């Protein structure tokens, strides 16, 4: 198996994978906080999770070149995780449109129904980048599971950091708990990445690349974790929010770099542009 080195599937695809995971994670985490009291939830925060995924989808569409390629690729859902991702994102965004209309019309019952349905679609959107990025044919099953856990946790932690950043402007009342959730998920990501990296050997070139890739997330996440810890002990809400905002940007940068490294590390079979559109 040769490493995945195609430059055309670099920044745009990595951005889509990052935003898909972050937007769906943000929705799942935020909705879970207010699942029993939706009347206290911020519509802007709920809809932000859909907006982030929509931006990611624009990155993917710009990569595909022409709009009709979107539908051509979607037909290939049986054999392509990227094609499945297009379908999952579309269902999730349609649900988000329904929630936006329900908020505009004041249909509280419909908001609850579509909100719960959105959790299912968000879970599918969250799984899509994990499954695409971890798809390695020549790494043992338990190691594939380990890489999936790291990718999943990094997506969840990115979603949590975005909530902490947005809460500063949209819902300051949840700033502290969003920082605490971010700290917990970043710690879990660092632990999982360290354990997975230490399980890899140095003899095989693929394992050396994998080790380097999974270690790349350690520095930015550690800096972000330190800043969040500093924010927790700050007594001034404005300073706490400012530190959390900086920590969020650093964590997002680390997540994007991690995905760029995954796309170039050879951890999964190469994506061939023509394969995306085969019927």
Predicted regions and their residues:
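Membrane helical hairpin/interfacial module
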Residues: 26-33, 38-91, 95
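Juxtamembrane membrane-interface segments at transmembrane alpha-helix termini
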Residues: 58-61, 83-85, 131, 257-265
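Juxtamembrane/interfacial segments flanking transmembrane helices
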Residues: 65-72, 133, 137-139, 202, ...
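Extramembrane terminal tails and long inter-domain/linker segments of multi-pass membrane proteins
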Residues: 1-15, 72-76, 80, 208-212, ...
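N-terminal signal-anchor module of multipass membrane proteins
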Residues: 1-36, 47-50, 265-268
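Short, 15-30-residue, compositionally biased linear elements
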Residues: 43-50, 240, 245-248
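Long, contiguous internal "core" modules enriched in hydrophobic/ aromatic residues
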Residues: 11, 17-22, 37, 76-82, ...
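Helix-boundary and loop/linker segments of multi-pass membrane transporters
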Residues: 5-6, 45, 74, 237-241
